[in-house]
C-alpha cells in the first residue's frame, strides 16, 4: 500500500519518501499541502526498535526526539522535587511515586497526564490454527478454525472452548489486576472496571467485578465441566489430545483440549509481563498456555490469521463518548463494533448499546449502560485492566501541540527550536 497508494495518501501533510518493512519509515513534506513552504519539520524518520535499552540509549544520546521510554527508565530524565526547592537533590530521582508533581532534569520536559487510554486483553471466541506448511511470518497465511468443544453432547466438536462464557469468566479471575497496576506499570494505571474510563459520562454504571481469585477461577472451570482429564504432554494448538483414564488420573492433568495462545509483542515489556503472569496463573489451575513474546512479523501474522486466544492491546478514544469504548470493545460486528476481532455477539449487550448510542435521554442512556455491563460481566470478551495516568518526557527543544485527550497529535503540529551560538532560541 505504501508503494502503490495515491500521491499524498494517508499522511496529507507529509509523503512517504522511503520505507523498510519492520524497520523504518521516512516522511517528507507534501508540497501540495505546504504551498508556501512554511512546514515546521523537513523530515520525520520513525524507526522500530524492539529493545528497550537500545531505545533508551538513542534517546539519551539525542539521536531521537521521541522514544518509547519504559516507565522504570523515566528516572533518567525526571524527578520529584520533594522539598520544593526547584533543584534536583540527592535521592529525589530514586522513584517517581508522586507522579502529578513531577519535575524535569536539565534538557528535558516531563509532564504528568491523566488520559482515557485503556489497557486491555481481548479474547478470541473463534481462534484458528495455521494450516500445515504455512509461514508464521506470512500475514496472508491460511488458517482453519479450531473446533474442540461439543456444545450439544452429540459427540461432534462444533465450537471452540473460547466461545463458552464460563471459560472467559474464569480467565478474567486469573489476572492479577492490582499487581500490574501498581508494579508492572508503577502506579501508572488507574483502576477501570468496564469499557468506560473514569472521567467519561456513565462511568459509574460499572463496578469492580473481576479480581485476582484463582480459587474462584478453578471453581468456575469445574462447574462448567472443564475438569482435569487431558494428558498435558499430548496437548497441541489444534490436534486432539489424549484423555487420561479416570483410574489413572493424578490431579495434574490439563483442563482444556488445546493450548491457549497469549499474544504479546517483543519490545513491550508490560505486555510481556502481563502475559507471563496470566500464563503462569492459568497453568496452576490446569490450563496450558503459550505466551512467549513474538517478533512483530509473527505477531501480525497471528493477528491477521486469527491464530490467537488472548491478546494484550490498548485503546485511545477518537471522541469523548462512552460508546467510543463500549461498541468497539464489546459491541458485536452486527452493530458496527468488535474492533478487536473477538467474534463476540451478545444480544443483550448489543441491544443496550444501540439504545445507549441513539437515545437523547440521560436516564435512558444510563440504564442502557447499566444493562450492558450486567450482561457483559456474565459473558466477558476481554480483560479490562486500567487507564493510563503517567509521565511523558521529551527533549526541551521539541515543541508539542496542546494536549488533547482524544486521538493523537499530528506530525505537522510539532516543531523544534533552533540552536544559535550553542543556545536554544525560544522555549517549548
Language-model segments: which ranges?
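Detector for C-terminal structural segments
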Residues: 20-24, 29, 112, 116-119, ...
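Gly/Pro-rich hinge or "lid" segments in bacterial periplasmic/extracellular proteins
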Residues: 1-43, 51-54, 214-223, 420-421, ...
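Short, well-ordered beta-strand elements
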Residues: 12-15, 25-26, 42-47, 256-266, ...
Amino acid at each position: 500500500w505504501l508503494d502503490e497508494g495515491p500521491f499524498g495518501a494517508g499522511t496529507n501533510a507529509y509523503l512517504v519518501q522511503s520505507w523498510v518493512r519492520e524497520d523504518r519509515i521516512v516522511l517528507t513534506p507534501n508540497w501540495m499541502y505546504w504551498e508556501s513552504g512554511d512546514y515546521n519539520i523537513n523530515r520525520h524518520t520513525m524507526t522500530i526498535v524492539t529493545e528497550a535499552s537500545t531505545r533508551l540509549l538513542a534517546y539519551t544520546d539525542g539521536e531521537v526526539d521521541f522514544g518509547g521510554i519504559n516507565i522504570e527508565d523515566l528516572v533518567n530524565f525526571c524527578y520529584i522535587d520533594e522539598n520544593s526547592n526547584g533543584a534536583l537533590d540527592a535521592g529525589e530521582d530514586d522513584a517517581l511515586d508522586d507522579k502529578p508533581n513531577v519535575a524535569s532534569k536539565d534538557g528535558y520536559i516531563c509532564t504528568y497526564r491523566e488520559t482515557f487510554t485503556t489497557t486491555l486483553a481481548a479474547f478470541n471466541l473463534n481462534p484458528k490454527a495455521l494450516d500445515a506448511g504455512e509461514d508464521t511470518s506470512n500475514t496472508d497465511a491460511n488458517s482453519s478454525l479450531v473446533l474442540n468443544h461439543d456444545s450439544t453432547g452429540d459427540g461432534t466438536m462444533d465450537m471452540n472452548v473460547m466461545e463458552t462464557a464460563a471459560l472467559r469468566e474464569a480467565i478474567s479471575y486469573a489476572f492479577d489486576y492490582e499487581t500490574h497496576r501498581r508494579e508492572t506499570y508503577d502506579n501508572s494505571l488507574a483502576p477501570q472496571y468496564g469499557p468506560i474510563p473514569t472521567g467519561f459520562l456513565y462511568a459509574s454504571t460499572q463496578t469492580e467485578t473481576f479480581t485476582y481469585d484463582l480459587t474462584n477461577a478453578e471453581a468456575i472451570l469445574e462447574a462448567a465441566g472443564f475438569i482435569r482429564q487431558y494428558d498435558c504432554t499430548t496437548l497441541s494448538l489444534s490436534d486432539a489430545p489424549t484423555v487420561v483414564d479416570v483410574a489413572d488420573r493424578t490431579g495434574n492433568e490439563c483442563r482444556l483440549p488445546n493450548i491457549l495462545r497469549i499474544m504479546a509483542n517483543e519490545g513491550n515489556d508490560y505486555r510481556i509481563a502481563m502475559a507471563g503472569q496470566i500464563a503462569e496463573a492459568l497453568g496452576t489451575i490446569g490450563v496450558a498456555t503459550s505466551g512467549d513474546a513474538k517478533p512483530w512479523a509473527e505477531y501480525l501474522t497471528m493477528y491477521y490469521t486469527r491464530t490467537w486466544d488472548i491478546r494484550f492491546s490498548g485503546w485511545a478514544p477518537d471522541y469523548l463518548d462512552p460508546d467510543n469504548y463500549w461498541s468497539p470493545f464489546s459491541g458485536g460486528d452486527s452493530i458496527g463494533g468488535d474492533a478487536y476481532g473477538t467474534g463476540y455477539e451478545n444480544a443483550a449487550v448489543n441491544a443496550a448499546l444501540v439504545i445507549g448510542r441513539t437515545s437523547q435521554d440521560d436516564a435512558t442512556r444510563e440504564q442502557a449502560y447499566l444493562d450492558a455491563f450486567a450482561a457483559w460481566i456474565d459473558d466477558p470478551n476481554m480483560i479490562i485492566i486500567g487507564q493510563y495516568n503517567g509521565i511523558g518526557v521529551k527533549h526541551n527543544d521539541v515543541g508539542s501541540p496542546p494536549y488533547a485527550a482524544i486521538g493523537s497529535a499530528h506530525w505537522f503540529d510539532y516543531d523544534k527550536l533552533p540552536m544559535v551560538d550553542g543556545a536554544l532560541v525560544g522555549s517549548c
